[in-house]
């Protein structure tokens, strides 16, 4: 909103023109979301404690997790509020890429909220029934996928960018909808599965969001996009604001979510953040790069698929427990060691993903 005010005030004082620069607003967006999260975090935690909205811990999980029972959850509300306020202040709300991303954050946030509400308030350990959760995710994802396909006006908006190959950019056509659907739903559930230890999911999310901020800026800049053989997407530049807001809100939340956690994000946070990363990857045409940079999320998801598949087909489990972070806990790794090592893996994969922009 302040973009429009600054644009109006520029006619009276040229200094307000600084707000027309995406980089300047991105910094302000990050700081706004960060300060908001740090300021309101203690207030939200106290309120959640008063309402007795505490984490439900499964009885068959690692014994070290029993102490987490009752820790305030649904802290993802803090993250989403920080992102929304920051983007509403510093983003260009006439940009359809920004609006689509906000819609995804809101819709998947609502799905996660319903799931959390049933678990911690209604005391239903299963939360939202799996088929209903998947159905709601599918509806939201398909709405976005169909809209993006039908509203595309440039060839680059529906091309598939293949890392390491500068000349391979096949036109997806109607398959774009299918790819977008699986990217959004898959990323949403992958981050949700990863969110099992203190700070484990939020830091990789912050790293990937920061990387996408850079990619969005490069894709929105004609010269940089041409130099790096990326599709030039003029609207992508404004996604930098969304990405840096995610970084700021995520770091602010990590202040309270780091081991030992004072609050958990819950499904309201993990489902929304994962879906947001998915739709941003779609908008900047880097779905494959998301698989690389979000490798920790992929690893967690694959471990669950392998575990379930192996048990159903062979009656044997591959891991001591899935997702895989629990496997290492049961092997005797202290929780902080698992968390930090997964962070290091995530950092490596994000840097590897960024390197592919030049290695073509």
UniProtKB/Swiss-Prot annotation:
Intracellular or extracellular location(s): Cell inner membrane
EC category: transferase
EC number: 2.7.8.13
Coiled coil: none
Main subcellular localisation: membrane
Pfam families: Glycos_transf_4 (PF00953), MraY_sig1 (PF10555)
Keywords noted in UniProt: Cell cycle, Cell division, Cell inner membrane, Cell membrane, Cell shape, Cell wall biogenesis/degradation, Magnesium, Membrane, Metal-binding, Peptidoglycan synthesis, Transferase, Transmembrane, Transmembrane helix
Gene Ontology CC, one term: plasma membrane
InterPro entries: Glycosyl_transferase_4 (IPR000715), PNAcMuramoyl-5peptid_Trfase (IPR003524), PNAcMuramoyl-5peptid_Trfase_CS (IPR018480)
Molecular function per GO: metal ion binding; phospho-N-acetylmuramoyl-pentapeptide-transferase activity; UDP-N-acetylmuramoyl-L-alanyl-D-glutamyl-meso-2,6-diaminopimelyl-D-alanyl-D-alanine:undecaprenyl-phosphate transferase activity
Cofactor(s) demanded: Mg(2+)
UniProt catalytic activity: UDP-N-acetyl-alpha-D-muramoyl-L-alanyl-gamma-D-glutamyl-meso-2,6-diaminopimeloyl-D-alanyl-D-alanine + di-trans,octa-cis-undecaprenyl phosphate = di-trans,octa-cis-undecaprenyl diphospho-N-acetyl-alpha-D-muramoyl-L-alanyl-D-glutamyl-meso-2,6-diaminopimeloyl-D-alanyl-D-alanine + UMP
Keyword Transmembrane listed: yes
Membrane-topology annotation of the record: Multi-pass membrane protein
GO biological process, one term: regulation of cell shape
Keyword Transmembrane: yes
Biological pathway: Cell wall biogenesis; peptidoglycan biosynthesis
Span of the signal peptide: none
Family according to the record: Belongs to the glycosyltransferase 4 family. MraY subfamily.
Cited function: Catalyzes the initial step of the lipid cycle reactions in the biosynthesis of the cell wall peptidoglycan: transfers peptidoglycan precursor phospho-MurNAc-pentapeptide from UDP-MurNAc-pentapeptide onto the lipid carrier undecaprenyl phosphate, yielding undecaprenyl-pyrophosphoryl-MurNAc-pentapeptide, known as lipid I.
Record-linked PANTHER family: PHOSPHO-N-ACETYLMURAMOYL-PENTAPEPTIDE-TRANSFERASE, PHOSPHO-N-ACETYLMURAMOYL-PENTAPEPTIDE-TRANSFERASE HOMOLOG
The protein, known as: Phospho-N-acetylmuramoyl-pentapeptide-transferase
Organism field: Shewanella frigidimarina (strain NCIMB 400)
């Amino acid at each position: 909103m302040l973009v429009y005010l600054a644009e109006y005030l520029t006619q009276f004082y040229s200094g307000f023109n600084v707000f027309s620069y995406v980089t300047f607003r991105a910094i302000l967006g990050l700081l706004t979301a960060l300060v908001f999260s740090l300021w309101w975090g203690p207030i939200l935690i106290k309120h959640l404690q008063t309402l007795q909205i505490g984490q439900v811990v499964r009885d068959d999980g690692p014994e070290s997790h029993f102490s987490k029972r009752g820790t305030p959850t649904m802290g993802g509300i803090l993250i989403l509020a920080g992102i929304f306020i920051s983007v509403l202040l510093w983003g260009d709300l006439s940009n359809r890429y920004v609006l689509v991303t906000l819609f995804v954050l809101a819709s998947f946030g609502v799905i996660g909220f319903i799931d959390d509400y049933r678990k911690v308030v209604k005391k239903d350990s299963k939360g939202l029934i799996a088929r209903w959760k998947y159905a709601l995710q599918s509806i939201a994802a398909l709405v976005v996928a169909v809209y993006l396909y039908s509203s595309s006006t440039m060839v680059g908006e529906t091309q598939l960018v293949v890392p390491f190959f500068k000349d391979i950019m096949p036109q997806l056509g109607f398959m774009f909808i299918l790819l977008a659907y699986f990217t959004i739903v898959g990323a949403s559930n992958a981050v949700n599965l990863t969110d099992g230890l203190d700070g484990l999911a939020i830091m990789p999310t912050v790293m990937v969001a920061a990387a996408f901020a850079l990619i969005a800026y490069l894709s929105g800049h004609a010269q940089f996009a041409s130099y790096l053989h990326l599709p030039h997407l003029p609207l992508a530049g404004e996604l930098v604001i969304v990405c840096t807001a995610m970084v700021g809100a995520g770091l602010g939340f990590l202040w309270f979510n780091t081991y030992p956690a004072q609050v958990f994000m819950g499904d309201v946070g993990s489902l929304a953040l994962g879906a947001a990363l998915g739709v941003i990857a779609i908008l900047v045409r880097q779905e494959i790069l998301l698989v690389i940079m979000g490798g920790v999320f992929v690893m967690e998801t694959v471990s669950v698929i392998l575990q379930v598949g192996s048990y159903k087909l062979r009656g044997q489990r591959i891991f001591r427990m899935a997702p895989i972070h629990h496997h290492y806990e049961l092997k005797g790794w202290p929780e902080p060691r698992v968390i930090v090592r997964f962070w290091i893996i995530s950092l490596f994969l994000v840097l590897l993903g960024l390197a592919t922009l030049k290695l073509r």
